[in-house]
Amino acid sequence: MLACPLQHLMSYASSIVALSERVSAFSAEGKDYLQAEAAICGQEPVTVLLRAYADSVAAKALADRNPGDRLIVSGEASLQQPDGDVPIITASVVSSAFDDQYLNEVVIVGRIGSDAKDAESGKSTRRSVAVNRFYRSPDPAAQEPIEVTDWFSIRAFGFTKDRLTAADVGALVEINGCFTQMTNAEGKPYSEVKARMVRVHRGSKGGSNPAAGTSAVGYDHESFQGQPDECPINW
């Protein structure tokens, strides 16, 4: 659990993924990477982009992997720009995984950026949480870094829904959950974070189990309902 008060924003993911393509060189935001499309393994796979800095030990571990290889990866989570539909995991840890394993964990510390939008069923609500990132400008004359904001879409149920709904716009929140993949009205996939825990640090496909058929526990729908005896909403 992250200590309180929190002074910074961050987003981090640990997942077991299967590579969908061969690893290739890629450049973005003035940095060189190795990159491959992958999918978080499970009953409901989630498409992600897996990256590693080109000169990192994670890149060396990733370089010779083949499509279909299963990997445990952990690192910074961000969203593909400009649409923000596909999660990116920039791995600092890469290791081999077994077929019966499942892991899909996301921690986000950011600012609430929208009012709550309830599902038609009333069983869940969705809000956006902003996480700012900075990178060096490719212009040598530029003195200020370039700021990019990732807007993570958060889906919450049960008591977790109540906590997320009660948070003020601009509040600093900590979200613990997992990536899920949804489809919009045009049939285009996009990602959400299904919240297991929501904690407010400073004011200003619901029922399925994506780990079904594996040895993992803690991903059934009940694990995302929250508990009535958790910390109060304004903790």
Give, region by region, the residue ranges found by the protein language model:
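Acidic, gly/ser/pro-rich intrinsically disordered tails
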Residues: M1-A13, S20-D32, A39-P45, L49, ...
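Structured N-terminal alpha/beta-domain signature
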Residues: V17, I72-G75, G110
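Flexible glycine-rich surface loops and low-complexity tracts that mediate binding to linear polymers
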Residues: G68-P82, A171-T183
